[in-house]
Design a protein with these regions (language model features):
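Nucleotide/phosphate-binding catalytic cleft detector across ATP-hydrolyzing
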Residues: 1-16, 20-206, 224-226, 249-251, ...
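A short acidic Gly-Thr/Ser loop motif
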Residues: 10-16, 80-82, 207-214, 220-223, ...
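Extended, folded domain segments that form the structural surfaces/walls around functional sites
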Residues: 11, 197, 209, 303, ...
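A conserved active-site cap/scaffold subdomain adjacent to cofactor or substrate pockets
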Residues: 232-253
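Glycine-rich phosphate-binding loops at beta-strand->alpha-helix junctions
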Residues: 262-264, 319-343
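Amphipathic, non-transmembrane alpha-helical scaffold segments
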Residues: 294-301, 305
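A short, acidic, amphipathic alpha-helical segment used as a generic capping/interface helix at domain edges
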Residues: 304-314
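Glycine-rich phosphate-binding/hydrolytic loop that grips phosphoryl groups
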Residues: 350-359
Length: 359
């Protein structure tokens, strides 16, 4: 990417579609120019269930983004949930004919192409190769090897594989909208540069994006993308629990969640009374204590973190995580979510501050 390039990304979530327009700055980082969104229910538990609804939502967000950024959008990068992604680690050793000629850009490009030479599981296809580091013959790790003197170098890269069927569905959707797909990017990888600060980018972190209906897991060991998955639980499950247990409308449940959102009962300062306005159970008391509401929220949040912990433990990717970064509209408005995460995961957790967001 060159300085000044305009990059467009589109994320299809459980409750909405987002389009983000960014520009590459002088440091090679993408600064957000604008972000637009539109409600959409065409995705359920990570599966596309309504191509037409998704197409209309994408078209709406693109139109809004074009007006806001004053830029015509013809193509975009598209995110893919972690459940459809397989990451294969591969290393390629490139021998050079002349040690004193210096490593050329072509040498690096050839090594990247060699990294694609892997056994591809049935039903998967390669969508990207992400170089994580290059090691010279003296053991030195460099990010930009071009011009370095070395008799050989080792390229370490992640080969990103995605389900062919999901790509077919995405292609069909974007064909309807008239937008070319520049590339397909795992959601966690796309969020990494926006959600992690400079220090976190070099640390071993797990990025958790708890959305409305799904939680995206992304694990990074420095520059190396090691694991991703999707857990089919999110903020909407908390709202549904409140609605069912208290027998109130989902609209009121969502309002109460936002107003009294707290992840742990132990942090209650004042156990206020709450009047239920839409309670459908005549035998039920229409007034509850806030602790009753927070107990419902706490139980579901504990379950979400417990399932995440089981997933990363079962897949042997937990031991190297130093920090968990928490983000996502499904949980960021619930106070002490980071504390609940630390208790259940037994790893330091903090909320994402995000970066390079210009508003």
């Amino acid at each position: 990417m060159a300085i000044g390039d305009i990059i467009v990304g589109i994320d299809i979530g459980t409750s909405k579609v987002c389009t983000v327009v960014g520009e590459v700055n002088n440091f090679g980082q993408i600064e957000t120019m604008c972000s637009t969104s539109c409600k959409c229910n065409g995705l359920k538990k990570g599966k596309i269930i309504n191509e037409e609804e998704i197409s209309l939502s994408i078209a709406k967000t693109i139109k809004d983004a074009e007006e806001e950024a004053n830029f015509k959008i013809n193509s975009a990068y598209v995110t893919v949930p972690g459940k459809y992604v397989t990451i294969v680690q591969n290393s390629v050793v490139k021998e050079l004919k002349d040690k004193f000629a210096g490593i050329s850009l072509k040498d690096v490009q050839n090594a990247i192409m060699q990294a694609k030479d892997i056994e591809i599981p049935e039903g998967k296809t390669i969508v990207d190769i992400v170089p994580s580091e290059i090691v010279l013959d003296n053991g030195k790790i460099v990010t930009d090897p071009v011009g370095n003197l070395s008799s050989s170098f080792t390229l370490r890269a992640q080969i990103i594989l995605v389900d062919k069927e999901y790509i077919r569905e995405l292609t069909s959707i974007f064909k309807r909208v008239g937008i070319e797909i520049d590339g397909i990017v795992p959601t966690a990888l796309a969020e990494r540069n926006l959600m992690l600060d400079t220090n976190e980018l070099h640390d071993n972190v797990m990025l958790l994006d708890i959305g409305a209906g799904n939680t995206e897991i992304g694990i990074f060991e420095g520059n190396t993308f090691t694991y991703t998955n999707t857990i089919p639980l999110g903020g909407d499950n908390i709202t549904n629990d409140i609605s069912l247990v208290l027998n109130i409308s989902e609209e009121e449940a969502e309002k109460l969640k936002k107003q009294y959102g707290l992840a742990l009962k132990s942090f209650i300062d004042n156990d206020n009374e709450i009047m239920l306005n839409t309670c459908r159970d005549e035998s039920r008391n229409k007034v509850i204590k806030s602790s009753e509401l927070i107990e419902i929220i706490e139980a579901r949040i504990e379950e979400i973190f417990t399932i995440i912990n089981k997933d990363i433990t079962t897949n042997n990717v937990k031991s190297n995580i130093n920090t968990v970064i928490l983000t996502g509209r499904g949980i960021t408005n619930i106070n002490k979510s980071d504390v609940a995460g630390k208790i259940n995961l037994n790893i330091p957790v903090k909320m994402s501050t995000g970066r390079l967001i210009s508003t």
